[in-house]
Swiss-Prot record:
GO CC annotation: plasma membrane
Provenance organism: Chromobacterium violaceum (strain ATCC 12472 / DSM 30191 / JCM 1249 / CCUG 213 / NBRC 12614 / NCIMB 9131 / NCTC 9757 / MK)
HAMAP family assigned: CobD_CbiB
First-listed, main subcellular location of the protein, grouped into a coarse class: membrane
Official protein name in the record: Cobalamin biosynthesis protein CobD
Coiled-coil regions listed in the entry: none
Protein origin, superkingdom: Bacteria
GO MF term set: ABC-type vitamin B12 transporter activity; threonine-phosphate decarboxylase activity
Membrane spanning residue stretches: 61-81, 83-103, 152-172, 292-312
Subcellular location: Cell membrane
Record bears the keyword Cell membrane: yes
Length: 312
């Protein structure tokens, strides 16, 4: 059965239910990742040559990804589960409602003048230091997270579901989790996490650019395209650059700029064009992601119906 037919159902489940209230499968996967890391990691960083560290990391991600991807493929082929399994797995892979809820808490806190709460809660969704951010800094950090995670947590999962079905959604979500845990450029993970980071970059290459296209089509298209073309190449990430530059331009706000990470000030290129964002722009960013998500669902469903009619 065409995967596109399941996509609106899974998105409705996410909209109605959000993440599982008690236990998400990714929590268990994260524990497994830590166990595999303990077994696969050498005695200390730098104890082995670079190639061997990278090989260890590559073997670890293959060990973690292959069984779950194959299990999803097998379960989705069972006659009694061919609808339930794909819908359930895509529902678990997409985090649209969770992203919107986190952003809404920050938006509401800023709207009510509670800067301390806004700083605390934006710290849940970004890695930068948030304790000294002003209102504009909190709004900027939140919008950047919404735009980037809109690609990572929503559109990329939808893309791989449409391309490879349930196994694609599982493969992508688990690979993205591995990148979040191992894809750091520090002493411990620079080489061991190299394969996880590169694999995630590869999986996100096309989805990121389709996400950027979605943002500019649903916002200020000319501004979004200009920012994408001129600013994305300056950003530190080849996939986040197009997404955030196009999104900032589509919203007509200024993002990027310097930020403090783990006590160290990091200069970042500017993104977007327009005024400094406010709490109202957080809501606009969330709506941009949501409209894009349902646009993908509508286009996918229309394509599935058209293909079905042609082959009828």
């Amino acid at each position: 059965m065409n995967s596109a037919l399941f996509l609106p159902i899974a998105l409705l489940l996410d909209r109605l239910l959000g993440e599982p209230p008690r236990w998400h499968p990714l929590v268990g996967f994260g524990r497994l990742v830590k166990a595999v890391e303990r077994a696969a990691y050498p005695a200390a960083p730098g104890a082995e040559p670079v190639w061997r560290m990278r090989l260890r990391g590559a073997a670890a991600i293959a060990l973690l990804l292959a069984p779950f991807t194959l299990a999803a493929w097998a379960l989705a082929r069972l006659p009694l589960l061919e609808i339930i399994v794909p819908v359930a797995l895509l529902y678990l892979a997409v985090g649209a409602r969770s992203l919107a809820q986190h952003a809404e808490v920050v938006r509401k806190a800023l709207a009510e003048g509670d800067l301390q709460l806004a700083r605390e809660r934006v710290g849940w969704i970004v890695s930068r230091d948030t304790r000294e951010l002003d209102e504009a800094g909190v709004a900027r950090a939140t919008i950047e997270s919404v735009l980037e995670n809109g690609s990572d947590a929503v559109f990329a999962a939808l893309f791989w579901f449409l391309v490879l079905g349930a196994p694609g959604a599982v493969l992508y979500r688990l690979a993205n989790t591995l990148d979040a845990m191992w894809g750091y450029k520090n002493e411990r993970y620079l080489h061991f996490g190299w394969a996880a980071a590169r694999f995630d970059d590869m999986l996100n290459y096309l989805p990121a650019r389709l996400t950027a296209l979605t943002y500019l089509l649903l916002g200020h298209a000319a501004k979004g395209w200009r920012c994408w073309r001129t600013q994305a190449p300056t950003w530190y990430s080849p996939n986040a650059g197009p997404v955030m530059a196009a999104g900032a331009g589509a919203l007509g706000v200024s993002l990027g700029g310097g930020a403090r990470y783990h006590g160290q000030w990091k200069e970042r290129p500017p993104l977007g064009c327009g005024p400094t964002p406010t709490h109202e722009d957080i809501g606009r960013a969330v709506r941009l992601v949501n409209r894009g998500m349902w646009l993908w669902a509508a286009l996918s469903l229309a394509a599935a119906i058209l293909i079905g009619a042609i082959h009828a």
